Amino acid sequence: MLKKFDKKDEESGGGSNPFQHLEKSAVLQEARVFNETPINPRKCAHILTKILYLINQGEHLGTTEATEAFFAMTKLFQSNDPTLRRMCYLTIKEMSCIAEDVIIVTSSLTKDMTGKEDSYRGPAVRALCQITDSTMLQAIERYMKQAIVDKVPSVSSSALVSSLHLLKCSFDVVKRWVNEAQEAASSDNIMVQYHALGLLYHVRKNDRLAVSKMISKFTRHGLKSPFAYCMMIRVASRQLEDEDGSRDSPLFDFIESCLRNKHEMVVYEAASAIVNLPGCSAKELAPAVSVLQLFCSSPKAALRYAAVRTLNKVAMKHPSAVTACNLDLENLVTDANRSIATLAITTLLKTGSEGSIDRLMKQISSFMSEISDEFKVVVVQAISALCQKYPRKHAVLMNFLFSMLREEGGFEYKRAIVDCIISIIEENAESKETGLSHLCEFIEDCEFTVLATRILHLLGQEGPRTSNPSKYIRFIYNRVVLEHAEVRAGAVSALAKFGAQNEEMLPSILVLLKRCVMDDDNEVRDRATFYLNVLEQKQKALNAGYILNGLAVSIPGLERALQQYTLEPSEKPFDLKSVPLATAPLAEQRTESTPVTAAKQPEKVAATRQEIFQEQLAAVPEFQGLGPLFKSSPEPVALTESETEYVIRCTKHTFTDHMVFQFDCTNTLNDQTLENVTVQMEPSEAYEVLCYVPARSLPYNQPGTCYTLVALPKEDPTAVACTFSCVMKFTVKDCDPTTGEADDEGYEDEYVLEDLEVTIADHIQKVMKLNFEAAWDEVGDEFQKEETFTLSTIKTLEEAVGNIVKFLGMHPCERSDKVPDNKNTHTLLLAGVFRGGHDILVRSRLLLLDTVTMQVTARSSEELPVDIVLASVG
């Protein structure tokens, strides 16, 4: 018996767990009691509890000792004590995977399963199914069928749930129990009906027609179980998504009808299903939103929370649909449950008007200190969305964010605020100086290294372009004096960027950098020495290449290439063009967050997608000597429909003078094996097909890869755009679908694929230039050309910008892909690297009158990339 002071002991942490210091050997020794007669039920049940505790705590039981304990436990079936019998069932289930010859208890369990004691029958079914494998299942099939339709609900449910588990290993046997499951689905018991429907669905889930018939049958006759209704709603919504069904479908009508069910859980499940259906219009959402609106005033906190959480999700895509609930949501702002209040506020922030923002900010500030960091992050994300929606309100929102930044909080919370402030600075030029000033104050007392270095990077990028850049120097240099090495290194880089862009400040910056040369840390000293030497040259090209824009290569790729160079010494200097370019802009790489504690741990450099392709292609003898891989297409191109007999996807790999087309092929016919599979290509331009590398064998549903190597045009190197007609050729061998054995003889066949396009974007790799003007000056005007074009089919600047960026495959710089409102002129700045490692920059001036006129100026370190860009645009 538990004593009265046990609760107090539990709270104090002393003596609360009677099994805390159990030893496996002692417990197994105690298990010998099972062999004694007469059986002591209380003592034996206590020992079984200890064994179960050890197993669930992860204690390893050897096969021999587990088997001995299991066999001893089987003798306890001689006792009729109900508690001991239930403990035996639990022990059988837990030890079924550890002990050997557990089937010895089959007869005892079968006897209990078919006996008159109802309290034994359900657990006996579950235990029996746990020890039964696919070879023994047919022996108990008759008993299982009887149990499924048993009039005792606990027995029927046990059999149905056990059948569901058995589906994984014995699908064909369990499938024969469908008639019994259908009979159980008509039960008046809510759990039996629910479990029966679950079994029926999992048996038929791969047959869409059968699932549709099942839904139709049960929705027509109605269901008694609210759990069954919830499951049918989920099945129906999944079916709607898979079939991309119209909202006129009977399935949607069924889900909508469940909004009028008498059970709250069914009503909520239906509302949740509707709002989560892709492509739902505001009109179709209206009934679900109305139901959720009613739940907002429910006396049950769980219902209010569910409603406001779902409305919050709806507001992300359809804020206008939730506007009708604003009054109810405002009432929830003062809810005693802070989670509900926070969700209500963030939903209002997404749906509220511009005029209500000030009032909402005051309401939020009244309880921000009372909610957890997790919900504070939700509030910050809502404010970020609001800044994009109402840019004129950025001053009010930024002041609120700055007050939040000064409060106590964890890393994720502070990072969310900093992210939001930076996004406001990037979107609103007039907020830049205010935002930078507040961030300067924040890093004066910032405990998070990742955030401090990120803000210093931002100051180095944006600070020199402000009206009074010198005011930021004090804050940056304070970091050099007061912070640890990682932040000091970031501060040195930021100082160098000010010196590289402002000649008046250069002497002062050089003085500060000379002080940093004596730093204790190697990284800080090296950076200061490097930047000092570059800045003292007073050359814009050097500043742009080594300070303002830096390397655009993959850092893991650079590490691997340098390691390989040291392992295989060469008289030739290291060639930076052999390193793959960064697949993501470096600005994005720097902002990726890493926990501060993990920053100093050695990391294993993961191979990028392009490096994996590089290794795969280098292993093909025909591709030796092609040089480093320049670019792989970001997404494979589908050359067949997904439902056809052969599924072919192509990835384009670009080298300096060649292209390799990688065809990933899947044969979906189970009565055929394909051999010597190649894709024959016919180019429309001066490309030359050099060789085909076949996929030797393509069995059913096993992917294989073949390649086609082509040489780039030499006579007219500007003709890079090309259309290839593709035909897959192969040898077909018929095979037995069951065994997979193919015939010895085969026959030649072919399959026409979709045409494959090669565009200028396949020859240019995106590169981010943080300072486009510096990069423009660095490249110089030796190879500069300019032409004017009319885009007659395009009617807006936004459309023109989007089309140009996509067509050229270059990276928009300095947020020039964002077109300001109510403007009829815009300048788009694009940067990239042409195959061979040549920088290519494009400045495109756009003018909107009746159509869009575009003046394109291109610069490169070589003439060919400029000619190709202008020829492609023309």
Curated annotation (Swiss-Prot):
Compositional bias of kind Basic and acidic residues: 1-11
Region entry Interaction with ZNF289/ARFGAP2, spans: 609-874
Stretch list, region Disordered: 1-21
Matches recorded under InterPro entries: ARM-like, ARM-type_fold, Clathrin/coatomer_adapt-like_N, Clathrin_app_Ig-like_sf, Coatomer/calthrin_app_sub_C, Coatomer_g_Cpla, Coatomer_gsu, Coatomer_gsu_app_Ig-like_dom
Predominant location: cytoplasm
Membrane topology designation: Peripheral membrane protein
Gene3D superfamilies named in the record: Coatomer, gamma subunit, appendage domain, Leucine-rich Repeat Variant, TATA-Binding Protein
Keyword Nucleotide-binding attached: no
HEAT repeats: 64-101, 283-320, 322-355, 356-392
UniProt GO MF annotations: structural molecule activity
GO biological process: endoplasmic reticulum to Golgi vesicle-mediated transport; intra-Golgi vesicle-mediated transport; intracellular protein transport; organelle transport along microtubule; protein secretion; retrograde vesicle-mediated transport, Golgi to endoplasmic reticulum
Location relative to the cell: Cytoplasm, Cytosol; Golgi apparatus membrane; Cytoplasmic vesicle, COPI-coated vesicle membrane
Cellular component terms (Gene Ontology): COPI vesicle coat; cytosol; endoplasmic reticulum; endoplasmic reticulum-Golgi intermediate compartment; Golgi membrane
Subunit structure: Oligomeric complex that consists of at least the alpha, beta, beta', gamma, delta, epsilon and zeta subunits. Interacts with ZNF289/ARFGAP2 through its C-terminal appendage domain. Interacts with EGFR upon EGF treatment; interaction is essential for regulation of EGF-dependent nuclear transport of EGFR by retrograde trafficking from the Golgi to the ER. The coatomer interacts with KDEL receptors; the interaction is important for retrograde trafficking of KDEL-bearing proteins from the Golgi to the endoplasmic reticulum. Interacts with COPB1. Interacts with TMED10 (via C-terminus).
Entry's family note: Belongs to the COPG family.
Functional note: The coatomer is a cytosolic protein complex that binds to dilysine motifs and reversibly associates with Golgi non-clathrin-coated vesicles, which further mediate biosynthetic protein transport from the ER, via the Golgi up to the trans Golgi network. Coatomer complex is required for budding from Golgi membranes, and is essential for the retrograde Golgi-to-ER transport of dilysine-tagged proteins.
Protein name, as recorded: Coatomer subunit gamma-1
Protein species of origin: Bos taurus
